[in-house]
């Protein structure tokens, strides 16, 4: 089992040093997990094609998200839905300050999506565009957004619980 003490020992630090910077193990894991976004954003840049409609982009965003989230469900659940997920915006800003090239190849809509700290803010930008295009009714946009996020949160949670028993093909 992983612990702050074990991480500190392996890194050559006293555990008190890590506790100075991180509240607990989940907080530390949130910061360490951000590197998983690099693979996700690179895949997203490859998967989003010029000329795609907004709805096609949105589907592709979630297909790509699911691909990576189902393979590392504990990490993705912790990042987007866990105890410290409200801090994700701060962590993402720091990450993209260090690795701005990870936003290359994305249009303005997707750059906005990738730099948001929570799923609601992230997806709202795309749903608002879908409303302006007439794909979703304005009065139904908020509930649509909440349902989409809740469904994906439950999928990632299920993947986390099932572990290796999860049939990835049927969930993607």
Predicted regions and their residues:
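Amphipathic alpha-helical interaction segments
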Residues: 6, 60, 64, 78, ...
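Hydrophobic/aromatic-rich alpha-helical bundle segments in the mid-to-C-terminal region
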Residues: 109, 120, 129-172
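Helix-turn-helix
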Residues: 1-27, 31
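Alpha-helical structural segments
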Residues: 10, 27-67, 71, 78
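Amphipathic alpha-helical packing segments from all-alpha helical-bundle domains
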Residues: 86-132
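Helical hydrophobic small-molecule/effector-binding pocket
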Residues: 59-98, 120
């Amino acid at each position: 089992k992983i612990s702050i003490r074990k991480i500190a020992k392996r890194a050559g630090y006293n555990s008190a040093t890590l506790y100075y910077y991180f509240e607990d193990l989940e907080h530390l894991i949130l910061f360490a997990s951000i590197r998983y976004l690099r693979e996700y954003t690179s895949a997203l840049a490859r998967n989003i094609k010029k000329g795609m409609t907004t709805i096609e982009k949105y589907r592709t965003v979630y297909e790509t998200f699911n691909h990576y989230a189902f393979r590392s469900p504990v990490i993705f659940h912790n990042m987007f839905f866990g105890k410290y997920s409200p801090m994700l915006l701060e962590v993402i800003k720091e990450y993209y300050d260090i690795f701005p090239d990870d936003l290359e190849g994305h249009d303005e809509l997707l750059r906005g999506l990738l730099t948001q700290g929570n799923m609601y803010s992230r997806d709202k930008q795309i749903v608002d565009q879908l409303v302006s295009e007439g794909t979703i009714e304005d009065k139904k946009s908020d509930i649509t957004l909440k349902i989409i996020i809740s469904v994906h949160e439950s999928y990632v949670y299920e993947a986390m619980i099932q572990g290796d028993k999860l049939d990835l093909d049927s969930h993607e």
